Amino acid sequence: MAEQVFQNFETLQLHAGYTPDPHTRSTAVPIYATSSYTFNDSAHGARLFGLKELGNIYSRLMNPTVDVFEKRIAALEGGIAAAATSSGQAAQFLTIATLAKAGDNIVASSHLYGGTYNQLNVLLPRFGIKTKFVRSGKLEDYAAAIDDQTRAIYVESMSNPDYVVPDFEGIAKIAHEHGIPLVVDNTLGAGGYYIRPIEHGADIVVHSATKWIGGHGTTIGGVIVDSGRFNWNKHSDRFPEMVEPSPSYHGLKYWEAFGPATFITRIRVEMLRDIGACLSPFSAQQLLLGIETLGLRAERHAQNTEKLSKYFESSPNVSWVLWPGSESHPTYSQAKKYLTRGFGAMLSIGVKGDASAGSKVVDGLKLVSNLANVGDAKSLAIHPWSTTHEQLSEDERLASGVTEDMIRISVGIEHVDDIIADFEQSFQKAYGS
């Protein structure tokens, strides 16, 4: 495909990264169900293992089906390359483990998905990597948190579940002034449809591909995208592993050999090699099928979410509505600036009543599913206080934007009138009105 000619999202989601293979001319991406690949000869194998030549060695490192998925996501996000992982949590862990080591820290917004907060706050400190959480969105607070051991700033493009949209350009400027990359979890950005963080200064983008990218609740997967814009050589004092001789490859210097692709190369040839959190070709094929309709789904998701938000704003059973497209949202001005193709596919509401009211409303839904996922074509709802953020302390939950009365809703592509009717009947059961 001549990707330099065809650059529109809806075209890239169907064609980027794949040309029919010369053997079968298959128009669909084949599933390469193989663990390993035959070398031309021993010398060829030696060149591959020594990174003197790029090619397939073992499917833990790369696989032709997975390769198409990686190239397609990189194209959609505007990066130079991508590496697929077994899950979004794996993508996040491998990214941070590549940037930081024992004794280092990262600076992160406190407005995060519960699993992310737990990984940063509980798991990574066991490896000697600490996180400094910034509760406000103030740029000066991000700057104040950075010290000589800081290796990245980490934010979500729309935080889950309170949909805070950060000032990407302002935070990126601060990160770059201090010689560190900005890492953005763009899961809620739907594969780059609602926002492409790289265009606003992000250096690395991660996704849970399980969500809108796959789009049908069938497959667990993650992906890391490298913008190729961060100069690791310039900031070698913070990132010596990017430029100094690597003990893994007989003194190979990544920056010297791979330049702008240094970070994503280390992800592949060190992290995927040593940690093994790779994506299977079967999962890659499922995710590729999802990507083909991503733009169409994302458009309908956003339309339905806006209409559902207006319904909730007029409901006597709802105390408040959190939706980034609402003028009452704390970061509406930033959402309006950065989310140019719709305000996403999620919203949260606060229901009236005691602490059990949220659970009662969720339990009364018939069409909307009560489960721990987002980004499905079907509508989903959950009570975060007692589920996704339950492992956090009360103070940590509040810092993440989670309250007892909150219901988080991932709005699907059903007819919006039916989604509204389902909430209406559940409110009737819970409140009698």
From Swiss-Prot:
It is an enzyme of class 2 (transferase). It comes from the Eukaryota. Coiled coil: none annotated. GO terms for cellular component: cytoplasm. SUPFAM superfamilies: PLP-dependent transferases. It comes from Gibberella fujikuroi (strain CBS 195.34 / IMI 58289 / NRRL A-6831) (Bakanae and foot rot disease fungus). It holds the Pfam family Cys_Met_Meta_PP. This is Sulfhydrylase FUB7. One of its GO terms (biological process) is cysteine biosynthetic process from serine. Its cofactor is pyridoxal 5'-phosphate. Sulfhydrylase; part of the gene cluster that mediates the biosynthesis of fusaric acid, a mycotoxin with low to moderate toxicity to animals and humans, but with high phytotoxic properties. L-aspartate is suggested as fusaric acid amino acid precursor that is activated and further processed to O-acetyl-L-homoserine by cluster enzymes aspartate kinase FUB3 and homoserine O-acetyltransferase FUB5, as well as enzymes of the primary metabolism. InterPro entries: Cys/Met-Metab_PyrdxlP-dep_enz, Cys_met_metab_PP, OAc-hSer/O-AcSer_sulfhydrylase, PyrdxlP-dep_Trfase, PyrdxlP-dep_Trfase_major, PyrdxlP-dep_Trfase_small. GO terms for molecular function: cysteine synthase activity; O-acetylhomoserine aminocarboxypropyltransferase activity; pyridoxal phosphate binding. The gene is FUB7. The modification N6-(pyridoxal phosphate)lysine is found at residue 211. Its EC number is 2.5.1.-. The keyword Ubl conjugation does not apply. Gene3D superfamilies: Aspartate Aminotransferase, domain 1, Type I PLP-dependent aspartate aminotransferase-like (Major domain). Pathway: Mycotoxin biosynthesis. Fusaric acid is phytotoxic to plants such as cotton and banana. It has been shown to induce programmed cell death in plants. In addition to a mild toxicity to animals, fusaric acid exhibits acanthamoebicidal, antioomycete, and antimycobacterial activities. Keywords: Pyridoxal phosphate, Transferase.
